[in-house]
């Protein structure tokens, strides 16, 4: 382990969750089962679906203690990849709650939700946000670029199973890269009716994608926090289009739908 790597970062201001302190259980080498085309970390360095302990729980909690009295709304597990890949996820969540008493949130791509152990550990959090960008198998491959063996049907089954077991708040987060036609909107409504989330969050990329690993990608920065380092500009929908879509979806399903503020860029 790189002992100089900061596993706790922020606080950052989130339009979704307020003032949030970040916990990174993955570590210095970005590790994920997705390699999303818009990822703010840059290209993922280690593509994997295997769970392991990246940073010992005691090290994370020791660092977290230095942030007392934790004047934040929520403590969020995300960071340098997919947090459910951390085999000590449950220990970390238990430790955070015991140490701080704060609400906990995990941002996940839902690729491991068919694993009963992962679902049990995630259930220790107060809030879970699952990613749903690809509404069809080909979209999943094109936008999220998962590791081999990950299929959309498996992800959807895992989310539905988890929702049936989870007593906290489950939100669906979707990155909208281009305007949706009616077929896409109908498909999204169909999937939401199966998942039955507490809330839907529509997002769009707020900055370019760096071409190499960027630690700054963990924060909620806007603009270009990468200086003169190489980036890829991402074409996406404008804020007003996103807001209009949010109103349509909310009106159709009766579930709260929020979206990134128009002036986020």
From Swiss-Prot:
InterPro entries documented for this protein: Aldolase_TIM, GTPase_Obg, rSAM
Keyword Metal-binding: yes
One Gene Ontology molecular-function label: 4 iron, 4 sulfur cluster binding
Listed PANTHER family: FEMO COFACTOR BIOSYNTHESIS PROTEIN NIFB-RELATED, UPF0026 PROTEIN SLR1464
Pfam families for the chain: Fer4_12, Radical_SAM
The protein's name in its UniProt record: UPF0026 protein slr1464
Names of the cofactor(s): [4Fe-4S] cluster
Binding positions for [4Fe-4S] cluster per the UniProt entry: 32, 36, 39
Keywords, comma-separated and alphabetical: 4Fe-4S, Iron, Iron-sulfur, Metal-binding, S-adenosyl-L-methionine
Domain Radical SAM core: 16-252
Sequence similarity: Belongs to the UPF0026 family.
Region of interest (Disordered), ranges: 204-230
Organism of provenance: Synechocystis sp. (strain ATCC 27184 / PCC 6803 / Kazusa)
Co-factor note (free text): Binds 1 [4Fe-4S] cluster. The cluster is coordinated with 3 cysteines and an exchangeable S-adenosyl-L-methionine.
PROSITE patterns documented for this protein: RADICAL_SAM (PS51918)
């Amino acid at each position: 382990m790189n002992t100089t790597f900061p596993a706790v970062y922020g606080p950052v201001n989130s339009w979704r969750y307020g003032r949030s302190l970040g916990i990174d259980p993955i570590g210095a080498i970005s590790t994920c089962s997705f390699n999303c085309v818009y990822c703010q970390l840059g290209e993922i360095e280690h593509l994997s679906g295997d769970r392991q302990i990246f940073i010992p729980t005691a090290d994370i909690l020791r660092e977290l203690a230095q942030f007392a009295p934790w004047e934040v709304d929520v403590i969020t597990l995300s960071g340098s990849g997919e947090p459910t890949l951390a085999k000590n996820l449950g220990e970390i969540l238990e430790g955070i709650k015991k140490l701080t008493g704060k609400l906990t949130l995990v941002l996940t791509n839902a690729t491991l939700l068919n694993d009963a152990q992962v679902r049990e550990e995630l259930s220790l959090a107060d809030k879970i946000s699952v990613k749903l960008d690809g509404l069809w198998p080909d979209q999943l491959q094109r936008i999220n670029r998962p590791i081999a063996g990950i299929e959309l049907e498996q992800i959807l089954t895992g989310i539905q199973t988890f929702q049936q077991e989870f007593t906290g708040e489950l939100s669906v987060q979707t990155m909208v890269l281009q305007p949706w036609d009616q077929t896409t909107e109908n498909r999204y409504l169909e999937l939401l009716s199966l998942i039955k989330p507490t809330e839907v969050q529509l997002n769009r990329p707020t900055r370019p994608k760096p071409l190499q690993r960027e630690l700054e990608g963990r924060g909620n920065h806007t603009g270009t926090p990468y200086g003169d380092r190489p980036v890829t500009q991402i074409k996406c929908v404008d804020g007003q289009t996103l807001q209009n879509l949010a109103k349509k979806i909310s009106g159709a399903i009766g579930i709260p739908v929020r979206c990134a503020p128009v002036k986020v860029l």
